[in-house]
Structure formats: C-alpha cells, structure tokens
Amino acid sequence: AYVDQGTMVDTWATVGSCAQIGKNVHLSGGVGIGGVLEPVQAAPVIIEDGAFIGSRAIVVEGVRVGTEAVLGANVVLTASTRIIDVTGSEPKESKGYIPPRSVVIPGTVPKQFPAGEFGVPCALIIGLRKASTDKKTSLNDALREHGVSV
C-alpha cells in the first residue's frame, strides 16, 4: 500500500496491499480500503488527493475515487456497484469511478428476484462538494449541506 503525506487514517481503518491513497485524504473510523496482490492484472484501489471517506465506507476491486470527492458513511463501492448521478434531470449510471468533488451516499435500486422485488445497494452522487467545505470547515459539512446525517 502507498499512503501519501498529510493523509489521516482514523481508528480501525484498514488499507489493503497495493492500494494507493493520495495526499491529504481523510479515512474515517472503520473504513476498509481493499487491496489486491493477485491476479497480477487486477487494478488497485486509488483514492485521489483531498478525498474524504466517511465512517465504515468500503472501497474495493480497483475502484477509483476522484480528487476531493466525499463518500458518506457506509458507502460500499466495488467494481460492479452501480454509481448513479442523480443531480441532473435524468439519472446517469456508471461503475468503478467517482468523479472529482462528488458527494456520494449509499442508496438502493429495485431488483426482481423469484421471491419478489428487493433493493440492492448502489451509490448515489447527490451533488458536488462546495467551496465552503474546502479546508475552512469540516468535510462532514459537505454531507450536511445535502441533508445527509453523518
């Protein structure tokens, strides 16, 4: 694993082998950053500079979190997790990458199974980190500004 300068790794946070954590990142309590040793072609988790990863969030399987993005508590990101940007008039879906300065919370999407319809986890991009949350105030404010408890 590589953890760059100025990064804060809080209590019970883990960073797996081969993960790359940028400068001035905040890994909150209980965060799990996955690592990969094999297969050789597997992509590492990359958390870019200035990102804030909320309590108990899990990021694995080659996911990349963009510069200054904010992941709320309990967000789970794998290579197959649906990431849905709900900030525009129509949702935009992607996988594996959180754009810079995005504010992300856990969500669910309906899926039909033989026993009925159930919600499966996804990640929702609910806005962009505002300048008011940069360095002057707690990054938790990025979530509070969007009405999300932290």
Model-based region annotation:
Residues A1-Q112:
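Structural signal for interior beta-strand "rungs" in well-ordered beta-sheet cores
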Residues K95, P100-S102, P106-V150:
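Terminal amphipathic alpha-helical/low-complexity segments used for targeting or macromolecular assembly
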